[in-house]
């Protein structure tokens, strides 16, 4: 979220205590530099007995309630002390940080159940497409005529499930500026509507954060939370929420650069949103790593980016791959045979062999990657013309860079290493999409018609067919 300063408020343990003038403190809240700060210019919060009695095991105050200068109801969640300074006897200045700042026109439970979350993500307008289309024409008198046409629907449902729905909602605002001009604003946001009330923390953890990762995965850049609000259970009053979510990336990302946009998603052969949110923990971990690498790839040191891309590829190689090469009985037979063969060797050698045997029932990196490439069919045939050369180089680079072999690392040209690393990320991206149910042709289409096309062209050039 962007930095913002909020109105000064009176704070207490609950709204009733403030109305009774009990245990009040005056303080201002600001969201700045990635932190949500409560600044108490005169007084201390965490040295009061009535406060310390409310602290949890982590010395965190679960909630603080307030009224601001405009008479609105405010609340802070999960407050921790940062600094406490005494400028003169009795003149204490305290600074605290919090996880959430909430504000509404009526009283609410800051950790209670809600029936709706509404979120605006960065780059969402480009991803979702405009609600308006404009037609320009020139009259015989030389005047420009503009005709605006709205799309038929005000919203598009991304997911309909037993728990509720996820919808992209469009909005158009019109405001006259002067007698000769008109300002028209076009925007979009995402609604999470719950059929049964859910607790706020669960809604953030189970729906908002995973969907944000899905959007980042589709956009190829961070889908940051710019605005957030909720509708508590039992009231129609909206609660606005501020929190130190990562700030939006600077500059626009145009939809032709994005791997998967909303219009493509609506025509996919499988319900990709549902498959992503419903994936098992192992695949979800790979999905989240891919989303974070897509966001950070341009700012990382090349060797570190390669290792994280290689880790992602290895996660996909191990996904649903059989864990054991041999049955327990066959493994025991082989181990007994080897042990009997080395029984006459000195103890140090025997111990070394026995330690190696404990790791002898897994699959090596080369075998796992070979099986993965075979399973990805036409996508890999198109992306990597020479799979043998790619596998050999990738395993060699991974071993050298993992163990920080300086002599080996120096052999790799930085541009080649960067092109290989980005290609591995695209390969892993395609593997995830195929595991989520898309066809090879759909994945190839995504790569060809997004910013991945440039990466794929360089990657294919590294490993041309013989």
Spans of model-derived segments:
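Charged, non-catalytic interaction/linker regions at domain boundaries
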Residues: 2-288, 298-300, 414-458
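Amphipathic, oligomerization/interface secondary-structure segments
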Residues: 250-466
